[in-house]
């Protein structure tokens, strides 16, 4: 038995389940084998299961610490699957500390971050995606993110993954039976059954991957860096996108010397906009530091908006406009050229592609064409705001789905290219394990520790 499992099986844990600070109500939560014994010492009697008792909370010396509601949920019919006891008192930090300290003195220990959800997972009350959805629901920054996290908590994502795993198990049984019992003369390579089922699984996996990418965008959003020479209108575009005066706008070059950040939502997708210092050779040490930070942000961006002043530049080819920038940037797959100030040139707004780079013409000052840009940003990230019934997803989920797909691609090659049944069976097994990592059916203790360690203490 690992240390991870031992702590889960033996200890009674306690933590404040409500946010730290002052509030009308504060909750202390316990889970584990000593919960009932601790409950009896604090309220003076054995609580009725799933019943709200309004009682004083006392020490063993009968000193009253607070009064409020006491709730007892005997396992396995509780959130964690263990005996759970809650004290719902007044939400002052001193009162919460007194109650929590008393619970520890009576035999509980302080819970690790996410340990209540961890125990729920270990006791099969939920799978890993549902446990993660609790944290995502708490941390959601938009209505759409909250709805998607709730659907994941209710099992929408898990169901899709479980269906894929079941299909793989069914296919593995057929393939491995043909290998292990050659006397049955099952020609799984020639009969087309395996090929058809494998194609069906990959098609369903592609659908889940598309939905998961949507869920990851809703959860994490995209980082958009606005870059360009001084006075190209970068700060004006930041203000236009954020809908407020986030940055100072003047005609003086070098006004923006550091990185400015704003966070908005585009139809539910978080957009992290980063305005940077104008890129140029500068004798000013402070400005040079800002320019280096700008390049640091460019290297990490999901999308780079290269801002140019359309008054001084006729070309729409980024290689002609700024060859030095393009050479330093290298890969242009994340680049969009933004031609600003079209209200002055009267050239019109819109989107086109030049030398493989999208070009958006707009006016950050008047707002003309800004909607074209926001629609473009959603499109390049593959975000579909019309999708209904989606679920929340994380980067690790995307990686696991892609990993499973790579094994299925390899299995396809073994089937059609070499007729290698044993190698196909191994690839199917690896794909199944990759998918099982998502729900936690096949997951290392180290990964579990990292996931639950990112949770709130009382969750």
Curated annotation (Swiss-Prot):
The positions annotated for binding Mg(2+) are 235, 256
Per UniProt, the keywords (alphabetical) are: Cytoplasm, GTP-binding, Hydrolase, Magnesium, Metal-binding, Nucleotide-binding, Potassium, tRNA processing
Predominantly, its location class is cytoplasm
GO biological process terms held by the UniProt record: tRNA methylation; tRNA wobble uridine modification
Q: Where in the cell is it found?
A: Cytoplasm
Q: Where does (6S)-5-formyl-5,6,7,8-tetrahydrofolate bind?
A: 29, 86, 125, 459
Q: How is the cofactor bound?
A: Binds 1 potassium ion per subunit.
Tell me which residues bind GTP. Answer: 231-236, 250-256, 275-278
Q: Which residues bind K(+)?
A: 231, 250, 252, 255
Q: Which CDD domains match?
A: trmE (cd04164), TrmE_N (cd14858)
Q: Which GO terms describe its molecular function?
A: GTP binding; GTPase activity; metal ion binding
Q: Which cofactor does it need?
A: K(+)
* Chain's role: Exhibits a very high intrinsic GTPase hydrolysis rate. Involved in the addition of a carboxymethylaminomethyl (cmnm) group at the wobble position (U34) of certain tRNAs, forming tRNA-cmnm(5)s(2)U34.
Q: What is this protein's record name?
A: tRNA modification GTPase MnmE
Organism in which the protein naturally occurs: Marinomonas sp. (strain MWYL1)
Q: What is the lineage of its organism?
A: Bacteria, Pseudomonadati, Pseudomonadota, Gammaproteobacteria, Oceanospirillales
């Amino acid at each position: 038995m690992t240390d991870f499992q031992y702590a889960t099986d033996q200890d009674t844990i306690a933590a404040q389940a409500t946010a730290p600070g002052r509030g009308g109500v504060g909750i202390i939560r316990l889970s584990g084998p000593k919960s009932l014994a601790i409950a009896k010492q604090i309220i003076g009697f054995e609580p009725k299961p799933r019943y709200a008792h309004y009682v004083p909370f006392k020490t063993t010396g009968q000193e009253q610490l607070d009064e409020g509601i006491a709730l007892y949920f005997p396992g396995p019919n509780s959130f964690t699957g263990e005996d759970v006891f809650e004290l719902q008192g007044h939400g002052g930090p001193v009162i919460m500390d007194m109650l929590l300290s008393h619970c520890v003195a009576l035999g509980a220990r302080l819970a690790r971050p996410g340990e209540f959800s961890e125990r729920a997972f270990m006791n099969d009350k939920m799978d890993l995606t549902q446990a993660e959805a609790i944290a995502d629901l708490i941390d959601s920054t938009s209505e759409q993110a909250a709805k998607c996290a709730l659907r994941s908590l209710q099992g929408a994502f898990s169901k899709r993954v479980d269906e894929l795993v079941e299909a793989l198990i069914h296919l593995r049984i057929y393939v491995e039976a043909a290998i292990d019992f050659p006397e049955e003369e099952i020609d799984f390579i020639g009969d087309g059954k395996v090929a058809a089922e494998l194609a069906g699984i990959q098609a369903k996996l592609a659908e889940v991957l598309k939905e998961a990418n949507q869920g990851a965008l809703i959860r994490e959003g995209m980082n958009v860096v606005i870059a360009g020479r001084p006075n190209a209108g970068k700060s004006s575009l930041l203000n236009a996108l954020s809908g407020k005066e986030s940055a100072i706008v003047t005609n003086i070059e070098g006004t923006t010397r550091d990185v400015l950040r704003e966070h908005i939502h585009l139809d539910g997708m978080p957009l992290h906009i980063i305005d940077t210092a104008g890129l140029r050779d500068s004798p000013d040490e402070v400005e040079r530091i800002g320019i280096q930070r700008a390049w640091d942000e460019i290297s990490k961006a999901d999308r780079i908006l290269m801002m140019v002043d359309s008054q001084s530049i006729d070309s729409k080819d980024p290689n002609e406009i700024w060859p030095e920038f393009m050479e330093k940037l290298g890969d242009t797959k994340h680049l969009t050229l933004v031609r600003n100030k079209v209200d002055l040139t009267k050239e019109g707004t819109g989107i086109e592609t030049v030398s493989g780079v999208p070009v958006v013409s707009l006016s950050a000052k008047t707002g003309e064409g800004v909607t074209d840009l926001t629609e473009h940003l959603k499109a390049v990230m593959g975000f579909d705001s019309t999708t209904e019934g989606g679920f929340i997803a994380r980067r690790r989920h995307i990686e696991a789905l892609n990993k499973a797909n790579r094994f299925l691609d390899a299995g396809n090659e073994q089937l059609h290219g070499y007729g290698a049944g044993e190698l196909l069976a191994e690839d199917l097994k690896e794909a199944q394990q990759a998918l099982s990592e998502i729900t936690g059916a096949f997951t290392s203790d180290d990964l579990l520790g990292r996931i639950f360690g990112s949770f709130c203490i009382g969750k």
